[in-house]
């Protein structure tokens, strides 16, 4: 089970009304649906393949699967006789909304997500043509951790690639010394993988222990980096 919370910065100028999460998968994966908990709206059937998944939504939020195999959470809204729709709920600036979740047997990888503001945050004033702007034009994109890898496909090479991303462009681990220790332990596990199983099962726990030691308030390993590397590393250790 993947649990999420949406944090809207205090400097934001609008509430969040829609969250999109990419769950697409290579052709041939299929369209396996697991249970959904909460309000499920009409979903498209002509979507690309996606990882097997179900989802959870907070109260007054709706779920659906869109034409790009994205899981979409959106707030209930009321359509007024005049003007833009008004959201019943949102993630206001400076607030946090929990209760979002994805259930899937797939292991984590780096995925794209997007947040879209409420209509009343961005789109209540007509433009020069007398038209109201579309809130989807104000989409803000980012990266998170979500179901990606089929368990039999998980490998130390994938964990190494994830570590390179978290210590590199993602900056999910911003401490170079910590990255160096993690990289050293992981490289030892990879080097010994073909020969000395005992060495591999010794280096991998050291990698996981370093993650544990460096994760928490004020520490350099972010939640995204921790759960991405921890879950995949523990899976490999358990299946060696």
Write out the residue ranges for each language-model feature.
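Extracellular or exported targeting regions of proteins
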Residues: 1-150
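Soluble extracellular-acting proteins and domains
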Residues: 146-240
């Amino acid at each position: 089970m993947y649990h999420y919370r949406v944090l809207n910065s205090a400097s934001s100028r609008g509430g969040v009304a829609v969250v999109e999460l990419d769950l697409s998968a290579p052709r041939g994966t299929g369209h396996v649906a697991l249970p959904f908990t909460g309000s499920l709206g009409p979903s498209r059937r002509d979507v690309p393949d996606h990882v097997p998944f179900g989802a959870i939504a907070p109260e007054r939020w709706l779920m659906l699967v869109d034409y790009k195999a994205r899981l979409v959470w959106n707030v209930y809204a009321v359509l007024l006789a005049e003007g833009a729709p008004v959201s019943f709920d949102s993630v206001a600036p400076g607030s946090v909304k929990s209760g979002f979740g994805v259930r899937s047997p797939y292991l984590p990888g780096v995925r794209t997500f997007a947040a879209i503001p409420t209509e009343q945050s961005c789109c209540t004033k007509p433009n020069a043509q007398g038209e109201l702007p579309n809130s989807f034009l104000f989409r803000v994109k980012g990266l998170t951790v979500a179901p990606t890898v089929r368990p039999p496909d998980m490998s130390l090479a994938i964990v190494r690639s994830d570590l390179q991303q978290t210590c590199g462009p993602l900056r999910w681990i911003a401490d170079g010394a910590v990255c160096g220790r993690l990289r050293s332990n992981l490289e030892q596990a990879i080097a010994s993988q073909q020969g000395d199983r005992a060495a591999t099962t010794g280096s991998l726990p050291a990698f996981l222990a370093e993650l544990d030691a460096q994760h928490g308030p004020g520490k350099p390993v972010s939640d995204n980096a921790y759960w991405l590397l921890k879950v995949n590393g523990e899976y490999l250790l358990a299946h060696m």
